[in-house]
Design a protein with these regions (language model features):
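Acidic, Mg2+-coordinating active-site environments of NTP-dependent enzymes
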Residues: 110-111, 118, 131-134, 138, ...
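C-terminal helical cap/extension that packs against the catalytic core
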Residues: 197-216, 230-234, 299-302, 308, ...
Length: 423
């Protein structure tokens, strides 16, 4: 088997009328020798900020001298990004070997595992074989029934900002969504929550109390944002002063405060994480596709916000970093998202829009999206391809800023097109 064949196998596994649940993942991992039982985890769930928070946690744990696995989704440029150790993506050869180990076990199962379940098994096997000290494990969707939730006793469960997303799968209210995320809270294991949504916080606190799990909520009164430019945002939090964070979204210091709180809880539970390692980890963190500046002048921003909750944070970042400026927006949005709410947030900042169709079956066609946008009194035109969209947005933007956003699923394509066009 080569890399292409391994990828083909992973992506060919379709969700064919599967019932959600952990049985398949447990069966598959048992056939592989239960690699997850040899590992320690920080489990990260939430609506927005999961990936950024996970990247910060992994970077700080690595700076503290640990061998750290990082499991995230989706990828931006290449599948291998989803499974990393100490910032290094899994090598192609290693991935092929793992697929060769996992495939026979999966094929032998009566109820065939889904793509995400296969990938979870690949990650667990790799991290165990590579003897990671700790793994930062990002939930795919929800919590309770997510395949990552086979882990029994995390060193810490971390719940990021909660908002309305995936309502079809998780339920129509914030309390329903919180209940799904609360599934990662395990008996006696510490929980650290972002908080800030009373309806959700009540649910999380109740579940933590039922599970006898020590519960900590981030104290944002101790967070001061002291500076921000196109290279870094500077903040102080609860005794850790003037940290220079290279993730420039205005919302990132809040994710960092969550990561710091979780790392300090881990320290209370015996992990050796000096404050100096937390600072180093945060100042060295990299997380592409989240309010990322591909070029300073004229500015080209790439952002992955894909629901109204995330879009609100991105719009605030655009206002903070580019005061008084209007943008050419390059957008693609999944048809099952709160499209109108997202567009209503963007419209006041828009010079005009260029729409494209991301390579995802759920993506709203560019033409349909452009019609939606015109209903807000904005100028919008549809491009035939992502590359044509990037070229047109750059042309319309002239010396002004361009921002590509609406889904993580087109970030990689936008970056590649941008690189080709500016080579």
């Amino acid at each position: 088997m080569n890399y292409e064949q391994a990828m083909e196998y992973i992506h060919a596994v379709q969700w064919a009328g599967h019932k959600p649940g952990l049985t398949r993942t447990r069966t598959l991992l048992a056939a592989l020798g239960d690699p997850h039982k040899k590992l320690q985890f920080v489990h990260v769930a939430g609506t927005n900020g999961k990936g950024s928070t996970a990247a910060m946690l992994a970077s700080c744990l690595q700076a503290a001298g640990y061998r750290v696995g990082l499991y995230t989704s989706p990828f931006i440029n290449r599948f291998n990004e989803r499974i990393q150790i100490n910032g290094q993506q899994i090598p192609d050869e290693a991935l092929v070997e793992l697929v060769e180990q996992v495939k026979p076990a999966a094929d032998a199962m009566e109820d065939v595992p889904t793509e995400f379940e296969i990938i979870t098994a690949l990650g667990m096997l790799y991290f165990a074989q590579q003897q990671c000290d700790i793994v930062v494990l990002e939930v795919g969707l929800g919590g309770t029934l997510d395949s990552t939730n086979v882990i029994e006793k995390p060193a810490c469960a971390v719940i990021t900002a909660l908002g309305m997303d995936h309502v079809k799968e998780l339920g129509p209210t914030l309390a329903d969504i919180a209940a799904a995320k609360a599934g990662i809270i395990k008996p006696g294991c510490p929980v650290v929550s972002y908080g800030g949504a009373p309806e959700a916080d009540t649910v999380l606190r109740r579940v933590a109390a039922q599970q006898n799990a020590p519960f900590t909520e981030v104290d944002f009164t101790k967070l001061q944002i002291t500076g921000g430019d196109l290279d870094a945002v500077t903040f102080s939090f609860d005794g850790l002063d003037e940290v220079r964070l290279p993730l420039i979204g205005s919302y990132q210091p809040r994710n960092a405060a969550l990561a710091i709180t979780a790392l300090r809880v881990l320290r209370q539970h015996g992990w050796n994480i000096p404050e100096s390692a937390i600072r180093t980890g945060l100042e060295q963190v990299s997380w592409p596709g989240r309010f990322e500046l591909l070029r300073h002048s004229p500015a080209f921003v790439l952002d992955g916000s894909h629901n109204a909750h995330g879009m609100r944070a991105t719009v605030q970042s655009l206002k903070d970093r580019f005061p008084g400026q209007k943008f050419v927006f390059l957008v693609s949005i999944m048809a099952d998202k709160d499209v109108d709410e997202m567009l209503a947030l963007l419209a006041p900042l828009a010079e005009r829009f260029v729409t494209v169709t991301a390579h995802n079956p759920r993506a709203m066609p560019a033409q349909t999206l452009a019609e939606h946008i015109r209903a807000y009194g904005c100028t919008a035109e549809a491009a035939d391809s992502i590359e044509a969209g990037v070229a047109r947005a750059e042309e319309l933007g002239g010396e002004g800023p361009v921002c590509a956003l609406g889904t993580l699923y087109f970030s990689g394509d936008v970056r590649q097109a941008f690189t080709r066009l500016n080579a």
